[in-house]
């Protein structure tokens, strides 16, 4: 078996990626989230496939087909809630994964980091089009508001919006194409995830100390496969608790009402994992400015390798930047809270302050703290 896995053309790839992969001996549980994201992706593709067998992407029957899945299909309610809450688990793991990358300086592996940003954007796009499919009130109005933002693009904006809608409003054509996008995008994510792994295995993993670990590597299996299995069991435990005990806690009550173009909900808001970006969008009174800020809130992650001037790798021995990092995390939580609040005083002002702080920390405070710490080392 040992010879086979090392010589067989297919098994050799698996062997180099998951069995004999040289891995730093000191990576912590924060490194588990990459494998958890892979598990989340598999859960989403499997549950999504079974949902797609019963779902109809037609405005007259979409809402009813989801109700039919929950009521008449064997374990349809479980598949639906695993899929809906699986998306939340996916984004929790994604945010922690990115947060760990920032904290431990994984962005210096620039190819892996940039493919990760593409993965992040593709996952957000998949989640957005998927949220539209149940055709509830918030699904419909969320789709209308977010797609309508493209009209802020000069010259081609209005034409682009109508082209995406497939008409003059969000209707049957929009739902059909969103279903098509939602079906194909996870497979594109899978392809990008393999590229992400390919680049990662070219350079090797980072580690908590930020030091070179070439002299202290251990095989991935059995040490980290066992460690990953523990993480997977914990992930499944939390997912099952969510799906079985609190299935609708992260959803929106407006989505229990079928989509009605003549009745606008009091507060239009996306799913919780988009609220930080939505708060940044709303904090700028100008439409085009808001759209640019929204895009930059994600794309600014690509600036981390460029703005990094530190002589040290990661934040483990850098108390000044650590303080700024945790302020950044707290600020993100504030933005998430603000995104779910109505557009009125004092929430608008808090949102504007938090949005300015978000960009200030990344563009100004982190590079400045890097320079300060570099000078402290010289003393």
Curated annotation (Swiss-Prot):
The record lists the effect of residue 108 to A as: In strain: Isolate MVZ 174053 and Isolate MVZ 174054
Q: Does the keyword Electron transport apply?
A: yes
Q: Where found, per UniProt?
A: Mitochondrion inner membrane
Q: Where does a ubiquinone bind?
A: 201
Choose any GO biological process term that the UniProt entry carries and state it: mitochondrial electron transport, ubiquinol to cytochrome c
Which CDD domains does the entry mention? cytochrome_b_C (cd00290), Cytochrome_b_N (cd00284)
Residues annotated as binding heme b b566: 97, 196
What quaternary structure, including any partners, is listed in this protein's UniProt entry? The cytochrome bc1 complex contains 11 subunits: 3 respiratory subunits (MT-CYB, CYC1 and UQCRFS1), 2 core proteins (UQCRC1 and UQCRC2) and 6 low-molecular weight proteins (UQCRH/QCR6, UQCRB/QCR7, UQCRQ/QCR8, UQCR10/QCR9, UQCR11/QCR10 and a cleavage product of UQCRFS1). This cytochrome bc1 complex then forms a dimer.
Q: What are the cysteine partners in each disulfide bond?
A: none
The cofactors required by this protein are:
heme b
Q: What does this protein do?
A: Component of the ubiquinol-cytochrome c reductase complex (complex III or cytochrome b-c1 complex) that is part of the mitochondrial respiratory chain. The b-c1 complex mediates electron transfer from ubiquinol to cytochrome c. Contributes to the generation of a proton gradient across the mitochondrial membrane that is then used for ATP synthesis.
A GO CC annotation given for this chain: mitochondrial inner membrane
Q: Which GO terms describe its molecular function?
A: metal ion binding; ubiquinol-cytochrome-c reductase activity
Q: What is this protein called?
A: Cytochrome b
Record keywords:
Electron transport, Heme, Iron, Membrane, Metal-binding, Mitochondrion, Mitochondrion inner membrane, Respiratory chain, Transmembrane, Transmembrane helix, Transport, Ubiquinone
Q: How does it sit in the membrane?
A: Multi-pass membrane protein
- Transmembrane intervals: 33-53, 77-98, 113-133, 178-198, 226-246, 288-308, 320-340, 347-367
Q: Which Pfam families match?
A: Cytochrom_B_C (PF00032), Cytochrome_B (PF00033)
Do the record's keywords include RNA-binding?
no
Q: Which protein family is named in the record?
A: Belongs to the cytochrome b family.
